[in-house]
Amino acid sequence: MAKITGNLVATGLKFGIVTARFNDFINDKLLSGAIDTLVRHGAYENDIDTAWVPGAFEIPLVAKKMANSGKYDAVICLGTVIRGSTTHYDYVCNEAAKGIGAVALETGVPVIFGVLTTENIEQAIERAGTKAGNKGSECALGAIEIVNVLKAI
């Protein structure tokens, strides 16, 4: 029985990153964590393109455009949605998650879900480089690994 695994070497790989501007004080940290991790694992900065969109709801469309371009081995999607007092949070979270997942399945390109969906600002800050780590960095590791798993199949 063969065991297929992916290594964490990003040398020679190209990445697209889509980041939401809404809650940019959090998303800037997620983006920095993702880029730092990709570079530490061998990616060159000129092999990483970033696109900014208004909010998490708009991420899937740009992710699909990047995935369909043929330029990228993986696309990383970063954003932050913080629950408010209305149901808007639920709609944005659900549609962003569905859309990002659909892009990966439709294109065959790894598309990583790095949209924080938190109950409050404190949880978002914790996941952007403080006590709960940096989810942007974790998404970058996931992107590298899944690209290499697919190459090994």
UniProtKB/Swiss-Prot annotation:
Keywords: Riboflavin biosynthesis, Transferase. GO terms for molecular function: 6,7-dimethyl-8-ribityllumazine synthase activity. CDD domains: Lumazine_synthase-I. Its EC number is 2.5.1.78. 5-amino-6-(D-ribitylamino)uracil binds at residues 22, 56-58, 80-82, 113. The keyword Transmembrane helix does not apply. It holds the Pfam family DMRL_synthase. It catalyses: (2S)-2-hydroxy-3-oxobutyl phosphate + 5-amino-6-(D-ribitylamino)uracil = 6,7-dimethyl-8-(1-D-ribityl)lumazine + phosphate + 2 H2O + H(+). GO terms for biological process: riboflavin biosynthetic process. The active site is at 88 (proton donor). One of its GO terms (cellular component) is cytosol. Pathway: Cofactor biosynthesis; riboflavin biosynthesis; riboflavin from 2-hydroxy-3-oxobutyl phosphate and 5-amino-6-(D-ribitylamino)uracil: step 1/2. (2S)-2-hydroxy-3-oxobutyl phosphate binds at residues 85-86, 127. Belongs to the DMRL synthase family. Catalyzes the formation of 6,7-dimethyl-8-ribityllumazine by condensation of 5-amino-6-(D-ribitylamino)uracil with 3,4-dihydroxy-2-butanone 4-phosphate. This is the penultimate step in the biosynthesis of riboflavin. Forms an icosahedral capsid composed of 60 subunits, arranged as a dodecamer of pentamers. This is 6,7-dimethyl-8-ribityllumazine synthase. It comes from Actinobacillus pleuropneumoniae (Haemophilus pleuropneumoniae). The lineage of its organism: Bacteria, Pseudomonadati, Pseudomonadota, Gammaproteobacteria, Pasteurellales. The gene is ribH.
